[in-house]
């Protein structure tokens, strides 16, 4: 999964994004296969998150970006409040209290929904934008989907390295 996706919105790049978004849940499941509950909840290194905490972090980040995508598709240039995925959103939702299997199932369901929405978009809809509080630039649906992919690729690569898979 050592891939990078251009910031240029093209049909090819959209296809790559959809492909990676489809593969990520499978990768997470494969990486967790055979790990005990203890292994899933212990830090992956000194000062590091556990696999469960990492998955929680991915869910929090995806939730914020997906919400931005959905708003951009529903409202013309919506304004999106700025709050941190982990420190604010995570503190409210407390996904960190769930078991890994529940988190992974939740991640898979969220991903199915996101993929259904994105796969039905016309290319022009990928250009719809949202503006986040405190930022001058507008971010497109493409940009936010790319953000999810790039963030998840980094974490998958890190997990593969730390788990030796």
Predicted regions and their residues:
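N-terminal first-folded block
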Residues: 27, 35-39
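Short, contiguous alpha-helical
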Residues: 4-5, 41-87, 115, 127-165
């Amino acid at each position: 999964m050592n891939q990078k996706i251009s910031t240029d919105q093209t049909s090819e790049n959209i296809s790559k994004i959809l492909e990676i978004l489809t593969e990520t849940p499978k990768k997470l499941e494969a990486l967790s296969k055979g790990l005990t509950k203890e292994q899933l909840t212990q830090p992956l290194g000194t000062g590091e998150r556990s696999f469960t905490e990492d998955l929680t972090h991915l869910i929090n980040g995806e939730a914020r970006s997906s919400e931005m995508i959905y708003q951009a598709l529903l409202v013309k240039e919506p304004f999106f409040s700025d709050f941190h995925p982990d420190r604010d959103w995570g503190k409210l939702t407390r996904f960190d209290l769930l078991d890994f299997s529940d988190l992974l199932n939740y991640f898979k369901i969220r991903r199915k929904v996101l993929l259904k929405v994105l796969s039905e978009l016309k290319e022009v809809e990928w250009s719809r934008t949202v503006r986040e509080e405190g930022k001058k630039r507008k971010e497109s649906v493409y940009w936010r989907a790319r953000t999810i992919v790039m963030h998840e690729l980094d974490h998958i690569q890190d997990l593969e390295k730390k788990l030796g898979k």
